[in-house]
């Protein structure tokens, strides 16, 4: 056998071996793919879709929800019965093709199975999502329906439990309860017949009506309590109180109280009748108006009761206050009469006392008859309270005026005593000032000082004459004492000023000697100042002349002399 043939045989054997190995590899790879597809199919088949379907079935779906559920359930049935069987057959066929090394058809079958599984996965995902949505929606709807029913049943129970609190509104409340119940029945009918949209609208209305009625039933008891209990009780209290006050001799400025009672009673009845319609805003507004009418009646009675208490106190105070005022006036009249012997008084005091008598008489005339006949009088106590208050205020003013007059009279004798003491003091001061001036040994007394001195002396003599009269005019004494005080103080200041100017002028004239020989202006001023000092007795002018001249040659010299003088100035001894 030639080597060529051998090589050909070897090559053929190698090709066969390689082909076989490749076939084995492809087969194993396909086996692996088929196994994975089998696992995917089994995983899909093992999903709890049946359990989820059973859970949704237990919800007892109705209407459109039930139709939708049936569609998705049928889709699952088709998928589980047909699609999975078809996939199983294709897998079996792919295994046979692979085992018989029909790799091309096996590969095609594997691709086909994978596509079927992808579609099955998508369908199962859609089915499960749809079931979840149906379950969630149904649970929400069930919870909503359950909540609405529970709310209605709770409202119904609370109304039945407190039916006595709703009074005349009970028939209308029961009517609205029946209407709500009818709406729930209509909801069930529509929902069962497959009309979920309209059923939902009916449920919305039933919920709204339940909530609205619940809110009403929360307000109604308070409104009914006022109309059936509070207002009638208050009105009975007012009417019985009114009768009792009339028996106790109370009178009222308001003449329509009985009519106002009737108005309140009618308003209560009208609001009770209108409450049947359950217009609670209007009922509450009417209740507020009724309460205001009742409160206004209470205010009237309380005003008169309060006035009566005040009057009882005032009718005890006023007679004693009148006696006190009259006694004060008598004392004032006696004091004025006593003082008139010695003093000429201001007519104002006597006029005031006469005015006091008139005010007292006016109060006696206006108030005492009422107090004396208090148990039979026919005026409202509030009117009498105002009259009594005015009387007490009038007596308060009288007493204040009496105190003013009393203090004024009490001060009259002190005024005279003080005036005499001041007069004696001023006369002594006048003599002391005169001695003070004489001791200065001045060339002469300035005319302005003499004018002030004689004016002061004349004022003191006039005050003395007034005090020596048989009847002293006390106001004149007051004015003259004030004038004398000012005159003496002015005289004292004038004396100090004259002596200071004279003393300082003498000192400056002596001091100017050091400048006269070489300062012509100082010599000239010296001559003028000396003439003013010794001849004219114009000490102020002389001081001004010499001080001005010295300041031109020695600034500050005048202040130095003035400061030294003020430290050693002699005072007038009184």
Swiss-Prot record:
The keyword Zinc-finger does not apply. Residues 102-141, 255-368, 409-495 form a coiled coil. It is a single-pass membrane protein. Keywords: Cell cycle, Cell division, Cell membrane, Coiled coil, Membrane, Septation, Transmembrane, Transmembrane helix. GO terms for cellular component: plasma membrane; septin ring. The chain crosses the membrane at residues 8-26. GO terms for biological process: division septum assembly; septin ring assembly. Residues 27-574 are cytoplasmic. Its main location: membrane. It is found in: Cell membrane. Residues 1-7 are extracellular. NCBIfam families: PRK04778.1-1, PRK04778.1-4. Belongs to the EzrA family. Negative regulator of FtsZ ring formation; modulates the frequency and position of FtsZ ring formation. Inhibits FtsZ ring formation at polar sites. Interacts either with FtsZ or with one of its binding partners to promote depolymerization. This is Septation ring formation regulator EzrA. The lineage of its organism: Bacteria, Bacillati, Bacillota, Bacilli, Lactobacillales.
């Amino acid at each position: 056998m030639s080597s060529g043939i051998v090589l050909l045989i070897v090559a053929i054997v190698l090709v066969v071996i390689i082909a076989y190995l490749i076939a084995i590899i492809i087969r194993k790879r396909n086996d692996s793919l088929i196994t994975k597809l089998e696992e995917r199919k089994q995983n899909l088949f093992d999903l709890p879709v049946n359990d989820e379907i059973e859970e949704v079935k237990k919800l007892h779906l109705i209407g459109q929800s039930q139709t939708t559920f049936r569609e998705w359930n049928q889709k699952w049935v088709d998928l589980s019965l047909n699609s999975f069987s078809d996939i199983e057959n294709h897998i079996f066929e792919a295994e046979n093709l692979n085992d018989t090394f029909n790799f091309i058809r096996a590969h095609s079958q594997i691709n086909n199975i994978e596509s079927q599984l992808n579609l099955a996965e998508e369908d199962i995902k859609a089915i499960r999502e749809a079931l979840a949505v149906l379950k969630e929606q149904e649970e929400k709807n069930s919870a909503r329906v359950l909540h609405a029913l529970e709310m209605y049943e709770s409202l119904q129970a609370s109304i039945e439990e407190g039916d006595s609190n709703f009074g005349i509104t009970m028939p209308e409340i029961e009517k609205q309860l029946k209407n709500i119940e009818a709406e729930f029945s209509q909801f069930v009918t529509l929902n069962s017949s497959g009309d979920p949209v309209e059923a939902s609208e009916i449920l919305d209305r039933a919920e709204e009506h339940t909530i609205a009625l619940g809110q009403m039933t929360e307000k109604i008891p308070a409104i009914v309590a006022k109309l059936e209990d509070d207002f009638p009780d208050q009105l009975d209290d007012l009417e019985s109180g009114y009768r009792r006050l009339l028996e106790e001799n109370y009178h009222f400025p308001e003449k329509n109280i009985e009519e106002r009672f009737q108005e309140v009673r009618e308003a209560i009845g009208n609001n009770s009748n209108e409450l049947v319609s359950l217009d609670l805003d209007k009922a509450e507004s009417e209740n507020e108006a009724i309460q205001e009418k009742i409160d206004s009646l209470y205010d009237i009675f309380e005003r008169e009761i309060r006035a009566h208490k005040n009057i009882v106190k005032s009718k005890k105070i006023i007679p004693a206050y009148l006696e006190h005022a009259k006694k004060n006036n008598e004392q004032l009249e006696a004091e004025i009469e006593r003082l008139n012997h010695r003093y000429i008084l201001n007519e104002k005091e006597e006029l005031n006392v006469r005015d006091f008598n008139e005010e007292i008489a006016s109060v006696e005339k206006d108030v005492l008859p009422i107090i004396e006949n208090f148990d039979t009088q026919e005026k409202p106590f509030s009117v009498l309270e105002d009259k009594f208050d005015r009387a007490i205020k009038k007596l308060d003013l009288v007493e204040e005026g009496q105190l003013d007059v009393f203090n004024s009279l009490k001060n009259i004798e002190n005024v005279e005593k003080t005036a005499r003491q001041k007069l004696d003091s001023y006369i002594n001061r006048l003599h002391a000032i005169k001695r003070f001036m004489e001791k200065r040994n001045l060339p002469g007394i300035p005319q302005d000082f003499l004018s002030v001195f004689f004016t002061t002396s004349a004022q003191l003599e006039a005050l003395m004459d007034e005090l020596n009269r048989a009847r002293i005019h006390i106001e004149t004494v007051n004015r003259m004492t004030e004038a004398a005080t000012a005159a003496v103080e002015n005289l004292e200041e004038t004396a100090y000023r004259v002596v200071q100017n004279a003393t300082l002028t003498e000192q400056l004239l002596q001091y100017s000697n050091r400048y006269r020989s070489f300062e012509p202006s100082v010599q000239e001023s010296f001559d003028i100042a000396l003439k003013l000092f010794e001849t004219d007795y114009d000490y102020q002018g002389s001081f001004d002349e010499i001080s001005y001249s010295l300041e031109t040659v020695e600034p500050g010299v005048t202040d130095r002399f003035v400061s030294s003088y003020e430290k050693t100035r002699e005072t007038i001894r009184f």
